[in-house]
Amino acid sequence: MFVSVGITASLTTILAAPVLTWVWANHLEPNLLRVTRLNWNLPKKFAHLHGLRIVQISDLHLNHSTPDAFLKKVSRKISSLSPDILVFTGDFVCRAKVETPERLKHFLCSLHAPLGCFACLGNHDYATYVSRDIHGKINTISAMNSRPLKRAFTSVYQSLFASSRNEFADTLNPQIPNPHLVSILRNTPFQLLHNQSATLSDTINIVGLGDFFAKQFDPKKAFTDYNPTLPGIILSHNPDTIHHLQDYPGDVVFSGHSHGPQISLPWPKFANTITNKLSGLENPELARGLFSFPEESRLLYVNRGLGGWKRIRFCSPPEICLMRCLYEP
C-alpha cells in the first residue's frame, strides 16, 4: 500500500512539474517586475553627480500580447523610483512592426524624468528586422522567416550549433530607423539619440549609438559633440559593442538585447553556459548584469529587458535598473 502511494506521488510530481513550469514561465514570471539597484561610486572629479538617479529600461517589444496592466505596473514603478534621468536602450517593438502605436505613445508619455528621457534603437526598431539567420550571419529577416515558432527554432539552433561571431551577410546594407517609430518618439518625452550626444546643463554627456546589427553603429559620429571634461553615459543596445568603444570616452554603458536570456538556468555551471548562448551574443558571458572594465575605468550594465517576441521567462524576470551616483570623500 505504502509503495503504491509512493509511486502515485512520484508520478504525480513527474507529470505536474512540467505543467507548473509552463504556467510559471508563461503566466507568472513575465509579470514579476524586478528592480535592480546599483551604485556608481564616483571619483572626486565627478562628485557633482552625487545623488543623481539614473533609471534604465530596455527591450519592451510592445505588441498585441503585452498586457496593459503590465505597462501600468512598469510606469508606476519607474515613477516611484524618482529618476533624474531615464534611458531606454532599444527594442521598443517586435520585428520592425509598430502593432499598437497609440499604446506605445501612451506608455512612453507616462514616463518622466526632470533632466530628460533618452533612447537609442535596437535591432527590432529599424524599417526591416535584422538578426542572425540560420547560418549565424547578421542579416535581414523576412516576414515569413520571422514567424514566432519558426524564429524560435531558428534562434535556438543558431545559438547552440552555428557560429556566434558577429559576421554580416554579404547582402546586408545599413538599415534606416523605422519611420513610424521615430514619428511616435517625437511626440513623447524621449529624445532619440541615433549616433548623437547630448550634454545636460554642463553636468553629464548622454551618448546614443545606432544598432550594431543594423550596420548603424557609428561611435566616431556619435562622440563628435562629446564634452571630454564631463562624465558620460553611453546607450548601446548590443553589449557586444563594448569592445568597439575602447578608443572612446564614457564611464557607464547601458545595454540590453540579450533578455537575460529569457530562459536561463543559473546552475549548474554548464547549464548556465548553454542558456547564455541563447542570447545570441558573440560574448555570451555578457548576457546579463554588471561588468567592470578597469583598464578603461568603465562599467557595463546589461539589462534583462521588459518583454520579448514571446512573453515567456524562466529565472530571468523582467527588469528595471536603478543606478545611484554616490561620492564618498
From Swiss-Prot:
Membrane spanning residue stretches: 2-24
UniProt-recorded name of the protein: UDP-2,3-diacylglucosamine pyrophosphatase LpxG
Pfam families associated with the record: Metallophos
GO molecular function terms noted in the UniProt entry: metal ion binding; UDP-2,3-diacylglucosamine hydrolase activity
UniProt-annotated location(s): Cell inner membrane
Homology family: Belongs to the metallophosphoesterase superfamily. LpxG family.
GO biological process: lipid A biosynthetic process
UniProt xrefs under CDD domains: MPP_YkuE_C (cd07385)
InterPro entries the record matches: Calcineurin-like_PHP_ApaH, Metallo-depent_PP-like, Metallophosphoesterase_sf
Recorded metabolic or biological pathway in which this protein acts: Glycolipid biosynthesis; lipid IV(A) biosynthesis
Top-level enzyme category: hydrolase
EC number(s) given by UniProt: 3.6.1.-
Co-factor note (free text): Binds 2 divalent metal cations.
Cofactor requirements of the protein: Mn(2+)
Entry keyword set: Cell inner membrane, Cell membrane, Hydrolase, Manganese, Membrane, Metal-binding, Transmembrane, Transmembrane helix
Origin: domain of life: Bacteria
Catalytic reaction(s) noted: UDP-2,3-diacyl-alpha-D-glucosamine + H2O = 2,3-diacyl-alpha-D-glucosaminyl 1-phosphate + UMP + 2 H(+)
Binding locations of a divalent metal cation 1: D59, H61, D91, H259
Any one Gene Ontology cellular component term annotated for this protein: plasma membrane
Annotated a divalent metal cation 2 binding sites: D91, N123, H257
Membrane topology per record: Single-pass membrane protein
Main location: membrane
Known function: Hydrolyzes the pyrophosphate bond of UDP-2,3-diacylglucosamine to form 2,3-diacylglucosamine 1-phosphate (lipid X) and UMP by catalyzing the attack of water at the alpha-P atom. Involved in the biosynthesis of lipid A, a phosphorylated glycolipid that anchors the lipooligosaccharide (LOS) to the outer membrane of the cell. Can functionally complement lpxH deficiency in E.coli. Overexpression of LpxG results in toxic accumulation of lipid X and profoundly reduces the infectivity of C.trachomatis.
